[in-house]
Design a protein with these regions (language model features):
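Solvent-exposed soluble domains appended to multi-pass membrane proteins
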Residues: 1-346
Length: 348
């Protein structure tokens, strides 16, 4: 590559908590990584190829980071520059207890990727800030889902004057794909910098967590990866609260329990379980049993009650007020992971 395509990413990686993130999918299946992150549940206890958003969550409510933080006064929001019904997110986010969902249909989108299939991510800076500003004097959790870096990646040459030039792929078609991909995530890296600047300017205590939901395919194998595993991406963080840098390799279902633990938040059935039992010998067996009880069993954990019912998800901003100090947790799912490009691509 002619230059580092993700300098903002690498700066955050050097200065704030980071690590590898083991995810359940490669090449596609964003919703399943998303499900693990938001609920603290593991996809290994579901059927092969299953999407919980389209199966169990169609009619069953599910405790999540949104419902847990709502219990302590947070407003909870989703922002996504794609259609609301993709992966049945409009229903799933209600079942997981979110307050609002701002999707592509509610945004003034004017810029698209060069091949025209996805909106660019720059619009998400303004929409994320709108979510944070929608609840005055209240803490907020915002889950922002990006889409600009998503495939398909064209085999024909689309970019006539790319900001980042790529060479060394086995074929011209493969080189075109990688050059397109790298330039799209270069723009996403600009979004990262702009988002951090925007939330820092607000002057509230804020933690930003960003993670890759899956690697692209494009012929990748474990031997191509620095991590040695195509099911590992990276997560990065930022905060303006003086939190220490604590690097750790995690699974997607452990990510938010780690972040909330660092922030002094110990809410929720699943997240508290990860915080207290992650190093125990019975951890995975207990995790499987707990998931079954909450999703398919009699909910003995809740004494048989429905403690986290679905919300009336609003496709608009509603104002809620609570007399608490404002602290913000923003989670951004980045649909890319440059850190683990093949070794050929990492050569600058």
């Amino acid at each position: 590559m002619s230059e580092d395509p993700i300098p903002n990413f690498h700066n955050l990686e050097s200065n704030y908590s980071t690590g590898y993130l083991t995810v359940p999918v490669v090449g596609a299946g964003t919703a399943n990584t998303e499900f693990e992150v938001l609920t603290g549940m593991s996809m290994q206890y579901f059927g092969t190829g299953e999407y919980p958003y389209k199966t169990i969550l169609k009619q069953t409510d599910c405790e999540s980071i949104a419902s847990d933080l709502s219990k302590i006064g947070y407003g909870t929001h989703v922002v996504h520059n794609n259609t609301a019904t993709f992966y049945s997110r409009n229903n799933a986010f209600s079942m997981m207890g979110f307050d609002t969902f701002t999707s592509k249909e509610l945004m003034n989108i004017t810029q698209y990727t060069p091949n025209g299939n996805w909106p660019t991510d720059d619009v998400l800076v303004q929409e994320t800030v709108k979510a944070l500003d929608s609840t005055k004097d209240q803490s907020d959790f915002v889950y922002t889902i990006t889409v600009e870096g998503h495939g398909d990646y064209p085999t024909e040459k689309i970019l006539t004057d790319p900001a980042i030039r790529v060479s060394g792929a086995a074929t011209e078609e493969s080189n075109n794909q990688w050059e397109y991909y790298v330039n799209m995530i270069h723009e996403v890296d600009d979004f990262i910098g702009d988002l951090i600047t925007a939330v820092d300017r607000r002057g509230e205590d804020t933690i930003v967590v960003m993670f890759g939901d899956h690697l692209p395919t494009m012929g990748l194998s474990d031997s191509d990866m620095k991590s040695g595993d195509i099911f590992k991406t990276k997560y990065i963080t930022w905060n303006n609260m003086g939190l220490p840098k604590e690097d750790a390799d995690l699974t997607a279902y452990q990510l938010l329990s780690q972040i909330t633990d660092q922030a002094g938040i110990h809410e929720g059935t699943m997240f508290s379980y990860h915080q207290t039992q992650r190093n125990s010998e019975t951890y995975l067996n207990g995790l499987e049993n707990l998931q079954y009880d909450l999703l398919y069993g009699k909910r003995y954990t809740y004494s048989g009650e429905d403690l986290y019912p679905a919300t009336d998800l609003r496709w608009m901003w509603r104002m809620l007020r609570f007399p608490i100090s404002a602290k913000t947790l923003t989670v951004t799912s980045l649909l890319f992971m440059v850190q683990d490009l093949p070794r050929m691509q990492r050569s600058l």
